[in-house]
Amino acid sequence: MELELGLAPPNSGHLVVDELSSSSSSGGGSGSAPVSASSAGKRGFREAFQETLLLFDDGSCCNTSDDDCRRRKKTVVGWPPVSSARRACGGANYVKVKKEGDAIGRKVDLALHSSYDELAATLARMFPTNDHQGEKKMANDDHGDAAGPVVTYEDGDGDWMLVGDVPWDDFARSVKRLKILG
């Protein structure tokens, strides 16, 4: 019994492709079922559809010593995909910075900074203040009670601390994100 896939009831008199080719080569007229014009013109599955490419490659086609194969199969780390070579060269230590009241946060590369003063200058360029706030700050500087923005950071333990309380190296190693208040 052969498996027939189709919408017609089983064994409805349709010939299988193998039977059709054997009956036409043997003389054609003495087949067990009549051949209609519509079934003779139908294509087989392999003729109707092309073979698809495999989406998964287990690497069995390449030798492990092949350098071209190694270059093609660079490993991907994280999301979005970043090649391991790019991640290994690294050196970048990006930290998210959010200012209270601003809808958009930014990122700062701490590897480009070597002190708190450089970081403060970068943050001042990234988050400029209005002219009125600058005038108030200058007026307060004369009296000695400058009320500038307070910068806090979240360390590796999840605690929020003031920027400048610890040495720069410890800060750069432990900071996860920055928040500017005021």
UniProtKB/Swiss-Prot annotation:
Q: Which GO terms describe its cellular component?
A: nucleus
Induction info reads: Highly induced by auxin.
User: Which residues are in the PB1 domain?
Assistant: 92-182
Locations listed in the record: Nucleus
Q: Which UniProt keywords apply?
A: Auxin signaling pathway, Nucleus, Repressor, Transcription, Transcription regulation
- Which tissues is it found in, per the record? Expressed in etiolated shoots and flowers.
Show the stretches that span the lipid bilayer.
none
Question: InterPro entries under this entry?
Answer: AUX/IAA_dom (IPR033389), AUX_IAA (IPR003311), PB1-like (IPR053793)
Give all cystine bridges in this chain.
Answer: none
At which positions is motif EAR-like (transcriptional repression)?
3-7
- Chain spans, region Disordered: 1-41
Q: Write out the similarity annotation.
A: Belongs to the Aux/IAA family.
Provide the function of this protein. Answer: Aux/IAA proteins are short-lived transcriptional factors that function as repressors of early auxin response genes at low auxin concentrations.
How does this protein assemble? Homodimers and heterodimers.
Name of this protein: Auxin-responsive protein IAA9
